[in-house]
Amino acid sequence: MAKTLDNIRNFCIIAHVDHGKTTLSDRILELTHAVSARELKAQTLDAMDLERERGITIKSHPVSMEYTAKDGKTYLFNLLDTPGHVDFAYEVSRSMGACEGALLVVDAAQGVEAQTVANTYFAQDAKLEIVPVLNKVDLPGANVAEVSREIEDILAIPMDDPLHVSAKTGVGCPDVLEAIVNRIPPPVTEGVDAPLRALVFDSVFDEFRGVITYVRIVDGSIKAGQTVTFMASGVSTTIHETGIFSPTKKPVDRLEAGQVGYLVGTVKDPSEIKIGDTVTTTRLGATEPLPGFHDIHPTVFCGIYPMSTDEFPKVEQGLEKLHLNDSAFTFHHESSLALGFGFRCGFLGLLHMEIVQERLRREFNLDIISTSPGVVYKLKLRDGTIKDLDNPLQMPDPTMFETISEPILKARIITPSESIGDVMRIVMDRRGMVEGTETMDAKRVMLHTMLPLNEILIDFHDTLKSVSHGSASMDYEPAGYQESDIVKMDILLNGETVDAFATMVHRTKARTRGIQMCKALADTIPPHQFKIPVQAAIGKEIIAREDIRPFRKDVLAKLYGGDVTRKMKVLEKQKRGKARMKEFGHVNVPQSAFIAVLKGTIKES
């Protein structure tokens, strides 16, 4: 059935974690009969168990549905259920590029949170029509008037015609459907006969059909049998199938301007399909791509090693399979004297890293060790060239470069007013700077801060939640690079460097971090027959030390009384043996010691 553009509405739903975005999606699917009552389950669009458990959306899930409005016309709704976390910011911005409007869901009890602010800015940058929806109005703690004021004052969105809903019970949800029809504009296009331009907003890998590309048709149309080109990557493919999401994939004869759907071609390598790329016909195609495309690069790196060397092929296989549906993360082989063979992996951010590691453990039943996360530093070499550094082991001698710069974040932290002092203190402790404050309401304040990315990697979120009694929320965006006094810190056991423990730290934090790591290792490495010094060093300078005291074998047990000189002789022999053992002995480091240091059990003091 042909759809005029006036009858199409493309929209997304944006919200802070736990404000009810996915529940509202479920209600919309139910009310438009896109999913039958028998098939409907909580969080229908969140396909991964991990998404359901954490209550977050990790992967975009588009869905098309038909709705007969009160005006008697039938409309085609295309809902793009996007991730909300900052790690997936580029994916969110491209998904928004496929929409004309957004439902902004705000919890009527919690109010505007950090992620609400960040995602609203994305929507405003994409020039979307924003429809505010106050959710959970049935809760006893709901304060509709106060939250409406916050939305007007902080987000500059007029609340002339607010929508009050309870996505859980369905109250007010039919009004949301009418608002989508009346307040979100239809797609604007050059027409069905114009050269094809389609925006790629996601892709998935199917082991039988290869890469399935999710697109929004901006201009023109496409059908099976046509040859298309991806303008940024230059890849060409013949289309075998076009289809829509309802909510599962359903083949259709053609996709036309304004529609959202999928393309199945002959591409087998997911890395060839880039989010934000423009698809056009190879023959008589568009000359100008859609604006906004750029390559995404990992910002957080860590090493992933199997607990047992026998599982190395399984870890490689697991990473390869995950990479097929998530080409944003990168990996390549690396080896460590301490941990053996493993992989150096790059991620879009901390949440992205946690998700990949958790999926390896859960979906492939693997035991892995992950080294401390690190960021990408920029070295200015003596000849003026800039070199990226994502692995402490590749850090050159300080005489080889002039300066080192680290990534900085612009962070918004929303916290209860009574916790503002503690929150400012932890920002300062992490080498951050508070640039300004903004009063949200009588009880909450928003801090505008600048923070080094390296400082929030280990336990910043935990500390933030702790000092604010679980009430603070935070969102951030990259703010470029800044010169800094970053040094490489090594850990030595019995005088030998252990490469797996090498880490990059700011010089002012090196001693504290060194003491923590030495203490953690001294507490977890069992005693040997000789004393083991555990040292932290920057270059040749030792900055921290702990000793593991030896256990003593009772060499006098076999002597029965007798001359004291005989006992002294045996003890002297033991002492010489221990000295020799200290010189040539090998320190056995148990897995628990690596895990204690590498899995972040060392917290900032």
Residue ranges and their predicted role:
Residues M1-S605:
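Structural and coupling elements of P-loop NTPases
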